[in-house]
């Protein structure tokens, strides 16, 4: 097996090089707070920032270091859509419902991009657009039909179809059959974005306490008692923002999200000539299929970040790195021989209906089920949850308190994932033959 690892190879996320995990606030949580936020990712921090700005005393708790989970492990895509493709969503919930949710996804993008701008968060945000690659002619036609349908339904979309003979403008690859150039999408440095949120929450007086897992919660009069190994907190409100890391202390929420491991690699520094050849426009790419691969430049355009094989557990990150390196060089042969400096993993979470969910259950607020669109939608719905907590009429969204399905006997351990991934790959293979 070829040596693909650079001397400085690490299994920490690439993003942590510039944004190490922040120090925790006082390790002993306060005895009281207006709001306890469980989960210190982008969702919880977005809520905490909006709450502290409205005069609430907020404590953010995490079982690990702040932002240890998906918020600093994701691909750093800031998109304008949902995982559920528009045509599929129309078939599932109808044209009116699909149009409403698609427009809400655009609002989520605009809110997150506006937050970066207004808060002056230095996270290398760039409005690059996105190339959605079609692995087959049938998928290209599906992308084309989806675009026509979105335009007919008045969904804000700025896109064009790129036929196979022009795809060299986007990527040095011949494995695709064209794709869709979707403008108005961006990329960020995931670690620095999260770091910026932590800094702003703390500047407003909010506490962010790591290594303090929530082990229990109970109703007490008009509020809650939140139990941790480091003491209890009397809270007026509780917001669960744990997504793929939801603990057993919240069984109702845990039963409704499916944690799925995703994997990424980062290459060594590449020459400007090679970077320009691989991604001529410096634009991120994601495949349009059920088990996609994705590729993007890093924050300064000197490396390639590549991800995929979501849900497939090979037992060790070095083995996963070899698999991803093989996929990367299959897609872009020019990257043959390039070594890796990082391979890492993190958990995304899917809902059973493939849609995000926000609402309140037994008095506890929640927002989760991002289905791999958590940077914009999570930031937005974290803010909207904060507005709901303070009673602001602008809190309402079409995602509030929608039926949040689960399955019989499911308790949060996705024992069925291997077979689900195999089925999705079978569906992809069928589409590839069409």
Q: Can you say where each PLM-predicted feature lies in the sequence?
A:
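Active-site substrate-recognition segment that forms the wall
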Residues: 110, 118-126, 214-216, 232-362
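Extreme N-terminal leader/targeting segments of oxidoreductases
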Residues: 1-35
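Glycine-rich active-site loop/strand segments that organize a redox cofactor
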Residues: 73-104
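C-terminal catalytic lobe of FAD-dependent flavoproteins
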Residues: 314-316, 321-429
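Helical element adjacent to the flavin cofactor pocket in flavoenzyme catalytic cores
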Residues: 149, 177-236
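N-terminal Rossmann-like FAD-binding beta1-loop-alpha1 element of flavoenzymes
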Residues: 33-60
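Rossmann-like flavin
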Residues: 92-200
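Glycine-rich FAD pyrophosphate-binding loop
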Residues: 53-73
């Amino acid at each position: 097996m070829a040596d693909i690892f650079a001397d400085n190879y690490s299994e920490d996320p690439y993003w942590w090089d510039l944004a190490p995990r922040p120090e925790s606030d006082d390790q002993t949580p306060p005895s009281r707070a207006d709001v306890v936020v469980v989960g210190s990712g982008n969702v919880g921090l977005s809520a905490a920032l909006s709450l502290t700005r409205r005069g609430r005393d907020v404590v953010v708790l995490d079982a690990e270091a702040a932002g240890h989970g998906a918020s600093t492990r994701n691909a750093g895509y800031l998109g304008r859509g949902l995982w559920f493709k528009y045509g599929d969503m129309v078939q599932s919930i109808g044209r009116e419902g699909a149009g409403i949710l698609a427009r809400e996804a655009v609002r989520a993008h605009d809110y997150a991009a506006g937050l970066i701008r207004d808060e002056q968060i230095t996270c290398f945000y760039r409005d690059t657009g996105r190339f959605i690659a079609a692995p087959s002619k049938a998928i290209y036609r599906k992308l084309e039909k989806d675009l026509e349908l979105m335009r007919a339904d008045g969904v804000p979309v700025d896109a064009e179809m790129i036929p196979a003979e022009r795809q060299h403008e986007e990527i040095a690859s011949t494995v695709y059959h064209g794709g869709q150039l979707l403008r108005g999408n961006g990329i960020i440095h995931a670690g620095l974005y999260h770091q910026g949120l932590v800094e702003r929450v703390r500047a407003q007086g909010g506490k962010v306490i790591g290594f303090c897992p929530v082990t229990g919660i109970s109703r007490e009069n008009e509020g809650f008692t939140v139990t941790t190994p480091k003491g209890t907190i009397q809270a007026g409100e509780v917001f669960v923002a744990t997504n793929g890391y939801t603990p057993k202390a919240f069984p109702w929420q845990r039963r409704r999200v499916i944690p799925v491991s995703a994997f990424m690699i980062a290459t060594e520094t590449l020459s400007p000539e090679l970077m320009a050849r691989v991604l001529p426009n410096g634009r991120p790419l994601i495949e349009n299929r059920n088990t996609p691969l994705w590729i993007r430049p890093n924050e300064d355009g000197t490396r390639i970040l590549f991800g995929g094989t979501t849900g497939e557990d090979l037992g060790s990150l070095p083995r996963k790195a070899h698999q991803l390196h093989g996929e990367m060089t299959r897609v872009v042969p020019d990257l043959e021989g390039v070594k890796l400096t990082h391979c890492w993993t993190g958990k995304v979470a899917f809902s059973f209906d493939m849609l995000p969910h926000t609402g309140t259950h037994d008095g506890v607020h929640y927002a989760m089920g991002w289905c791999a669109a958590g940077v914009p939608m999570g930031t937005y719905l974290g803010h909207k949850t904060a507005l709901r907590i303070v009673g602001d009429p602008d809190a309402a969204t079409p995602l509030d308190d929608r039926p949040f399905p689960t399955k019989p006997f499911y308790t949060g351990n996705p024992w069925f994932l291997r077979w689900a991934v195999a089925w999705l790959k079978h569906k992809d293979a069928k589409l590839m033959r069409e």
